[in-house]
Design a protein with these regions (language model features):
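Short, surface-exposed "cap/lid" segments of acyl-processing enzymes
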Residues: 2-43
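Catalytic histidine neighborhood in serine/cysteine hydrolases
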Residues: 37-39, 186-201
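Active-site nucleophile loop of the alpha/beta-hydrolase fold
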Residues: 44, 97-107, 198
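Catalytic histidine-centered segment of alpha/beta-hydrolase-like enzymes
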Residues: 50-51, 198-210
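Gly/Ala-rich beta-loop-alpha elbow adjacent to hydrolase catalytic centers
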Residues: 74-83
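Active-site nucleophile elbow and catalytic-triad environment of alpha/beta-hydrolase enzymes
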Residues: 137-157
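Short beta-strand/loop motif that positions the catalytic acidic residue
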Residues: 160-161, 167-169, 173
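Conserved alpha/beta-hydrolase "acid-adjacent" motif
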Residues: 174-180
Length: 224
């Protein structure tokens, strides 16, 4: 009898990033050498300018496949939060690897943008940002912060995830505070938090991320 195929492996990039992000590419290259295809999704849905969290979640769920398929989700920053909400809603997700996840995202965006910036965002309908994927100035509509505020009101910004989860978060991260990852992991036995001396991009910690993820996902990996 043919054994069932292993789970899909999906990578979810962060806000204003894209599927060609450094972490996504490096992880995909590493797992390709292990015989695993890590599919890097495009979460700029329906576009960066009109970015919608619900559209991001929908894109991931569509990529999971059929009813009997299973998936491992890697998520960076806002992609990490997206992965959490997909796992909360969809039993096909069997494990998460989260890199500096943007928990309490509405609160964190308010802190990053500041009250004057937030007021301008609401009044003009747009927030000026940097598109890291295309390396150019861009903007995102005010519907996004309204959507994230509503999301946080429903769940206090803390998704209810029951699957095994690995978090790698930098102690020097000034974009998504590590305190929220610590708080979220504290009361969840299935969550392992690894703290590293790094900032939000975690570029200096790629080797550590790969090592921790390999160990965490050992049940899903063939021996090298």
């Amino acid at each position: 009898m043919t054994p069932p195929p292993g789970p899909k492996w999906l990578y979810l990039h962060g806000f204003a990033s894209g599927p060609e992000s450094t972490k996504g590419v490096k992880l995909a290259e590493h797992y390709a050498r292990r015989g695993v295809h890590l599919e890097r999704l495009d979460l700029r849905q329906p576009s960066l300018e009109r970015l919608s969290f619900e559209a991001m979640v929908r894109t991931v769920r569509e990529a999971l496949g059929g009813e009997r398929d299973r998936a491992i989700l890697f998520g960076s920053s806002m992609g990490g939060l997206t992965a959490c909400h997909v796992a909360q809603e969809d039993a096909r997700v069997c494990a998460l690897v989260l890199l500096a996840p943007a928990l309490r995202i509405a609160h964190q965006m308010r802190r990053t943008v500041g009250e004057p910036g937030l007021r301008q965002w609401r009044e003009t309908g747009w927030l000026d940002i940097q598109d890291y994927a295309e390396k150019r100035p861009a903007r995102v509509h005010a519907g996004l912060i309204a959507e994230l505020d509503a999301l946080e009101a429903r769940s206090a910004g803390v998704p209810d995830v029951r699957v095994p989860t690995l978090i790698v978060h930098g102690r020097q991260d000034t974009t998504t505070e590590i305190a929220y990852s610590r708080e979220w992991a504290r009361d969840r036995r299935q969550v392992r938090l690894v703290e590293v001396e790094d900032g939000h991009e975690l570029t200096a910690s790629l080797g550590r991320i790969i090592g921790e993820a390999d160990d965490f996902l050992k049940p899903f990996l063939a021996s090298p």
